[in-house]
Curated annotation (Swiss-Prot):
<feature type="transmembrane region" description="Helical; Name=7">
    <location>
        <begin position="275"/>
        <end position="295"/>
    </location>
</feature>
<keyword id="KW-0807">Transducer</keyword>
<keyword id="KW-0325">Glycoprotein</keyword>
<keyword id="KW-0297">G-protein coupled receptor</keyword>
<feature type="transmembrane region" description="Helical; Name=6">
    <location>
        <begin position="241"/>
        <end position="261"/>
    </location>
</feature>
<comment type="function">
    <text>Potential odorant receptor.</text>
</comment>
<keyword id="KW-1003">Cell membrane</keyword>
<keyword id="KW-0472">Membrane</keyword>
<protein>
    <recommendedName>
        <fullName>Olfactory receptor 5P64</fullName>
    </recommendedName>
</protein>
<feature type="transmembrane region" description="Helical; Name=2">
    <location>
        <begin position="58"/>
        <end position="78"/>
    </location>
</feature>
<keyword id="KW-0716">Sensory transduction</keyword>
<dbReference type="GO" id="GO:0007186">
    <property type="term" value="P:G protein-coupled receptor signaling pathway"/>
</dbReference>
<feature type="transmembrane region" description="Helical; Name=1">
    <location>
        <begin position="29"/>
        <end position="49"/>
    </location>
</feature>
<dbReference type="GO" id="GO:0007608">
    <property type="term" value="P:sensory perception of smell"/>
</dbReference>
<feature type="topological domain" description="Cytoplasmic">
    <location>
        <begin position="221"/>
        <end position="240"/>
    </location>
</feature>
<feature type="glycosylation site" description="N-linked (GlcNAc...) asparagine">
    <location>
        <position position="8"/>
    </location>
</feature>
<feature type="topological domain" description="Extracellular">
    <location>
        <begin position="79"/>
        <end position="102"/>
    </location>
</feature>
């Protein structure tokens, strides 16, 4: 639709991303920093996926979900970071209509998947701590696969709202996107067609998913906390807390940023603040998650040592 003419107006076929800054020196500095972050993100998440796959002691539901979370983190970061790095070095930061749609769609898809997987992982911790005797029975391989497949289906359904909305937007005027990627809000501002209905639908679906998954997480940890407080063994409490700390940290970072970006009224913060928080959410958090889940996890550290030891003997 972006390639059709609208009366006397020529439809926009490419967009200019204004990015984070116009300063040439800052662009080089940001390029260097974000490139390092992206390389650590790719290495950390790929290492997590491969370690879980090759280590038999990590073939449990918790690590099955963690491997999918690492895949999603790779997807979130890769949906925007490579093009952002290229734009830092380009004189004119442009993106095609199709490229913009793909970027918007992939960011929405992986962002939704992260919400679902964090909720699934909270349920996994609830079953492991509150119902340990039923854990292996309830979270069978088949059920774990069903939870992950359901997460992907839910994410694709939500993503279809973004795809359809973007497809029906008509861009015939300004083509400067005041962001470092094609986020929905600045794209709606550029649309010549009425985007109010699309905005309401997407706000409802995205808000419903955010709140529903957050409620699942809160309820799960409410029962986990009650169970931990009832434990008589100090060692048992510490072990239970340690298994939840990593996940709670990841949840706090992720939901804190998306609530700031998509739930808080836009009048309470500036566009530049939105860019910084979006950068943290899409670039920094995917790098931090492998570190968060590995530094406090003795099973992952043990599996990593075992693999290194095995390599040195070969």
């Amino acid at each position: 639709m972006a390639f059709l003419d609208n009366g006397n107006h020529t439809a926009v076929t490419e967009f200019i991303l204004l990015g984070l800054t116009d300063d040439p020196f800052l662009r080089i500095v940001l390029f260097s920093i974000i490139l390092c972050i992206y390389l650590v993100t790719v290495f950390g998440n790929l290492s997590t996926i491969l370690l879980i796959r090759v280590s038999s002691q990590l073939h449990h539901p918790m690590y099955f979900f963690l491997s999918h979370l690492a895949t999603v983190d790779l997807g979130i970061s890769s949906s925007v970071t490579p093009s952002m790095l290229v734009n830092f070095l380009a004189e004119r930061s442009t993106i095609s209509y199709l490229g913009c749609g793909i970027q918007l769609s992939s960011a929405a898809l992986f962002g939704t998947l992260e919400c679902f997987l964090l909720a699934v992982m909270a349920y996994d911790r609830f079953m492991a701590i509150c119902n340990p005797l039923l854990y292996s029975t309830k979270l069978s391989t088949r059920f774990c696969i069903q939870l992950v497949v359901g997460s992907y289906i839910g994410a694709f359904l939500n993503d279809s709202c973004y795809i359809l909305s973007f497809a029906f937007f008509l861009f015939c005027g300004p083509n400067k996107v005041d962001h470092f990627f094609c986020d929905l809000s600045p794209m709606m501002e550029l649309s010549c067609s009425d985007a109010s209905v699309s905005g309401v639908v997407i706000s409802f679906t995205a808000g419903s998913i955010t709140m529903t998954t957050l409620i699942v997480i809160v309820i799960s940890y409410f029962y986990i906390l009650i169970t931990i407080l009832k434990m008589r063994s100090t060692e048992g409490r510490q072990k239970a807390f340690s298994t939840c700390t990593s996940h709670l940290t990841a949840v706090t970072l992720y939901y804190g940023t998306i609530i700031f970006i998509y739930v808080m009224p836009k009048s309470t913060y500036s566009r530049d603040q939105n860019k910084v928080v979006s950068l943290f959410y899409m670039v920094v958090i995917p790098m931090l998650n492998p570190l968060i889940y590995s530094l406090r996890n003795n099973e992952i550290k043990g599996a990593l040592k075992k693999q290194f030891y095995r390599k040195t003997l070969l």
